[in-house]
């Protein structure tokens, strides 16, 4: 029961021992986040709300919670993928092509509507360990060169603001110095450009709101990469916190 799919609603639920992670495909074909938190047994209760414009000052792409936002359209938030095509275009517009399940892995298939370019979003569920692994595979099916300017593994949505971000920093002889930082409006960026593991920043995030050793919610994630990486933690004007990790 690690992967539960409601095909009628186009909703996908990743169920681990104590947690649920739910997303789906909306009326515009966007992969949208619905829930991440304590386990909900009956995932059929989830519906994909129709995406409607709040006002002309709030574009659809600003208010929607995308699992994998790409560069283009009226997206002013951080994007996971940016590419340059042979004709100079840098805008991606994807369509949903379907899904595959192989054991504990769910693959969401996306395709650009203008170029022969595929993106597959991979989700692996490790039920006993309460872990979800995410990554993306990108394929250029044409004979033309496509330059990838940026790629992150995915975006996480945390339904709170004013969180505390924890990580470690350091230098030679003083590694692993723990620090905390209040997340406010704007972005926190952690990165490494050295090409190897470094003591300056570590590729993970821990976010909480007044959590203790025994109480409270803690959201965390780590990038399975020891070389160049980048991470962004962003608090939006809509009362949530976004997190991305990926290759720098």
List the model feature ranges, each with a label.
Residues 5, 10-13, 17, 21, ...:
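Polysaccharide-binding surfaces and accessory modules of carbohydrate-active proteins
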